[in-house]
Structures are given as structure tokens and as C-alpha cells.
A protein has these predicted regions:
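Interhelical loop and helix-boundary elements at the membrane-water interface
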Residues: 1-28, 36-272
Length: 272
């Protein structure tokens, strides 16, 4: 709970701490014995702490994002085991590696820098929810499916963005195929789609280390790609802001509310 409190911002710990305790209470005093949970906690804490510190050192995670990621990793392993940790670690590591290998020098305004707590939760919240539902319902097979599907969606979306930005050229509107500026949500490219497919196959393949091959493998791939496409569709609704200066070499719109310390004017879309 201390880790959760430290990773909460703007007083949100007043809500997050009791919510997290409420979620953990049934496990600490219910189906999973306290000894079992404590044993798993001690097993995984050094590993995820090392991973978090290395990620912080490489600037993949902010300080608060590191605490959140460590908390997430400990919780996933304590309640589910390695099958609920390895895929999401693969997602974070592959995303960071691709971001560095495929970075471009183009003037594209996108959200960069170390992942903060909200980004960690955005990517890890759905997998955690799948695990919690599985433990509550005592149906871990469906929990594993939901977990791998949600991680595949996040990986698919991340790989799609990285491959699309590096190799895709001008993206197309996902619905009417009109040209869009690079870096704005809602655009698709063929390399980006191939990246999405690759990300899904990557996570589904990791699942093979824990489960025998079956129809679930193809289902995870489809779910992952579908999640990436859905994200692009929702991206069309995301707020876009007018940049104060633009030209043929620089975009005119961004999804950032602020640019060089100046609050930008929203021209379309919805604020999330």
C-alpha cells in the first residue's frame, strides 16, 4: 500500500489506497493463504525491483512510474505466477527497445520520455483486471486468455506506432484513407499494421512457454490486432491542438495541450 500511495499523484492516494486494499483483502485473508502470497512476494520483489531500477536508469520509466511498475509486477506474480509477469515484461522491454532502435529525426510531436504512473496503469491495468477476475471466479484459464489478449493489444498498438513512424510514410485516416499528419492518432500505414500483427504474434508465442498450442494462440493474435485497430478508431476522437507555428516541414496539429510553455487552442476532438 505504501508503494501505491507513493505512486499516486495530486492526492489521488486518498482513493487509490483504499481501493487497492479492498482488492487485496480477499486474497490476503481468502482463497490464497497469507503464507503463499508472502512467499511469492519475497520471491519476485528483488527481480521486479532490479527491472524497475534498470528501466529508471535507462529513462524508460519516471521515478513514480518505476514504483507503479514494481507494484504491478509484485501484484501480478503474487496472485498469478510467472505467466502473468513474463508477457507484460516482454511488452515493456520490446516497446523500449523498438523506441530506441526505430527512432527518427523527423519533426513529429508525440508523447515521449519516461513512462509515468498513468501510462503504466493504462498498459497494465487491463491485464491486472483479467487476473483479478480469474482469481475471484476461480477460472484461471479465462483469466490467462484475458490477460494475454490485453497484453497483446498493448504490444500490438505499441509496435504498430513504432513501425509506422519509422517505415510508414504519411499515415492514412483509418476510415476514409485521407492523409494525416504523422504522430496524430487515428492514422494507419501498412508497416504499422504489420507491426501490430508482429506484436500480437510475439505475445501469443510467449504464451506457448506456459501452455500447449491450441486455438487460444490464434485468438490472442486476433484480439491483439483488434485492440490496435480499436485504439486507432478511438484516436480519431482524441483532442487535437493548433500549434502556434507550422510549415511544410513541421506539423500544424499536436495532441499535446502545451507546447514550449504555451497553452494551445483545441481545434477538434474530445479531451480524455
Amino acid at each position: 500500500l505504501t508503494l501505491i500511495e507513493n505512486s499516486s499523484a495530486n492526492g489521488s492516494d486518498n482513493l487509490s489506497v483504499p481501493l487497492v486494499f479492498g482488492v487485496l483483502f480477499p486474497f490476503l485473508f481468502g482463497p490464497l493463504s497469507r503464507i503463499e502470497v508472502a512467499s511469492r512476494f519475497l520471491e519476485v520483489l528483488p527481480f521486479v525491483t532490479l527491472f524497475g531500477l534498470l528501466s529508471f536508469r535507462s529513462k524508460s520509466l519516471s521515478s513514480s512510474g518505476t514504483i507503479t511498475a514494481i507494484s504491478l509486477g509484485v501484484l501480478l506474480y503474487s496472485l498469478g505466477g510467472w505467466i502473468f509477469v513474463v508477457p507484460i515484461l516482454a511488452f515493456f522491454i520490446s516497446g523500449s527497445v523498438l523506441s530506441r532502435l526505430l527512432q527518427t529525426n523527423e519533426q513529429v510531436l508525440e508523447k515521449t520520455g519516461a513512462r509515468d504512473p498513468l501510462q503504466v496503469i493504462a498498459n497494465g491495468g487491463a491485464p491486472l483486471l483479467a487476473l483479478l477476475l480469474g482469481v475471484f471466479s476461480s477460472n484461471m484459464d479465462w483469466a490467462i486468455m484475458g490477460f494475454l489478449g490485453s497484453v497483446a493489444s498493448a504490444t500490438s498498438d505499441t509496435w504498430s506506432t513504432e513501425w509506422g513512424m519509422r517505415f510508414g510514410g504519411a499515415p492514412r485516416h483509418i476510415l476514409n484513407l485521407s492523409r494525416l499528419e504523422k504522430g496524430l492518432s487515428g492514422g494507419v500505414t501498412l508497416p504499422g499494421f504489420m507491426g501490430a500483427l508482429g506484436g500480437s504474434v510475439f505475445i501469443a508465442s510467449i504464451g506457448l512457454f506456459f501452455m500447449s498450442f491450441g486455438n487460444w494462440f490464434w485468438a490472442i493474435i486476433v484480439i491483439g490486432v483488434f485492440g490496435s485497430v480499436t485504439d486507432s478508431l478511438l484516436g480519431l476522437l482524441q483532442a487535437k491542438y493548433q500549434l502556434p507555428e507550422s510549415n511544410d516541414q513541421a506539423p500544424s496539429l499536436t495532441e499535446k495541450k502545451e507546447w514550449n510553455g504555451v497553452q494551445l487552442k483545441k481545434v477538434k476532438g474530445l479531451k480524455w
